[in-house]
Amino acid sequence: QKAGEADVNLVISSVGFPAAKVLEERFSTPYVIGTPVKGFAGIIAEKLIDAAWTGKSQTAYFSVTSSGKNISRAANGIYIIGESVISQSLTAAMALKQGIDATVICPLETEPEYIGENVLLFSSEEEIKAAIAEAKTVIADPIYKTICADETNFIALPHEAFSGRIYRKEIPNLMEWVTI
């Protein structure tokens, strides 16, 4: 009943996007897309304030990942496999805090509106395995470890959409989590 009273909405994962679009259409409430992860929460806060003042929706991680500034675009072989909004927010945090880039692999259906140029949309295990064959580092749900090469540095980032509740106790607080 009070959904239309918000000044702005925060879309922290792709499943919240359809609701944010409806609220924008019905009540002209802008939204910001991005997950507040360590090293990136300040950008999210800035975008929320900006969206509330301007009434314009925006994707927070585009201001970091699409600009190319703060990022070494060298072929560093870092991949994040996961849900698109969370993974792109982690990529932005890594760019801001460490000056490195990562390629996101999203195996889930997602809207093109919030997909950056560093995102690969794959639906099969074979496509993902081929893409990460030479990876130096893979950040992903533990179920993906089996398709990584032995020499790949694998960093577990459990997500219930992939491994269910098996690793629930190991899901980190992303406001405290350091990726690399």
Each model region followed by its residue ranges:
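An N-terminal assembly and electron-transfer interface module characteristic of large anaerobic redox
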Residues: 1-180
